[in-house]
Amino acid sequence: MSVKNGLVQLENLTSMENLSIDEVMGLIKRASAFKAGKADFALDEQTFASNLFFENSTRTHHSFHIAERKLGLDVLEFDAQASSISKGETLYDTVLTLDALGVDICVIRSGVEHYYEELVNSDNIHCAIVNGGDGSGQHPSQCLLDLMTIYEEFGKFEGLKIAISGDLTHSRVAKSNMMMLQKLGARLYFTGPAAWYSEEFDDYGHYANLDRILPELDVHMLLRVQHERHDSGESFSKEGYHTHFGLTQERAKMLKPTAIIMHPAPVNRDVEIADSLVESPQSRIVQQMSNGVYTRMAILEAILAGKKAK
């Protein structure tokens, strides 16, 4: 990984832990250039990408597909049910096969944390791996689009007060963002049910009472309640959660006029956030979705630059 002539070069993108501040800022600025129509890009040769999603996805899956098409890549969509995965083939052997067929980039989402390690450490797999989310582990492209959205608003990260609220322990978005936001100089707070908080967050910020910190916040980043990762016997009340931990209309009145509201989506309206606030003037949720395409264009360009530099 490196930055040369203002352009980031990546071999793979699996975790925010692997990115430097210079690389992050380079990707943000390149994504902004794509968004403004000021980025020149042309493929030197035919390039193939395959999107392997083993968990449901709308935003990540389709924005990667659109980003790939905008860059001129040939896209091979992958249906696990129609593939040899349904016959018992492993993910490793599937990627080994795609690599042998000539696929250059595999974008993968899996419910298995760290699935990518055996792929990037293999001597026989040469295609680039982009992590589209691994269980409750990491979601680097979501983190980068979140950072782009924050940077568009404030032009900095240093000193910003940011709360990440909700289903923390099950959230790959929280874990990706907390690592990089702290490195970039933001001051982090975590809010939500105590049962969904763990000591791993202590090194990055402070567990806080939402009502006490709301008036100080620059960014309120909400997280989806991830029922699919909870124990089946865990009790949950939508109304109770919204009342005690959600961004209600009354709580939103406590925010500074300059504060912004974020959510990686999908949004559970009237659970994490009041329905009326999702598309409110302070919300940047739709902007996050749009920025996802440009951020992923920047990621893919960096991957291609890294392959070319080998």
From Swiss-Prot:
Keywords in alphabetical order: Pyrimidine biosynthesis, Transferase
Major enzyme class: transferase
Pathway it works in: Pyrimidine metabolism; UMP biosynthesis via de novo pathway; (S)-dihydroorotate from bicarbonate: step 2/3
Binding site for carbamoyl phosphate: 59-60, 109, 139, 142, 265-266
Catalytic activity: carbamoyl phosphate + L-aspartate = N-carbamoyl-L-aspartate + phosphate + H(+)
GO BP of this protein: 'de novo' pyrimidine nucleobase biosynthetic process; 'de novo' UMP biosynthetic process; amino acid metabolic process
PROSITE patterns hit by this protein: CARBAMOYLTRANSFERASE
GO molecular function (one): amino acid binding
Protein function: Catalyzes the condensation of carbamoyl phosphate and aspartate to form carbamoyl aspartate and inorganic phosphate, the committed step in the de novo pyrimidine nucleotide biosynthesis pathway.
NCBIfam families assigned: asp_carb_tr, PRK00856.1
Record-stated family: Belongs to the aspartate/ornithine carbamoyltransferase superfamily. ATCase family.
UniProt protein name: Aspartate carbamoyltransferase catalytic subunit
Organism: Lactococcus lactis subsp. cremoris (strain MG1363)
Record lineage: Bacteria, Bacillati, Bacillota, Bacilli, Lactobacillales
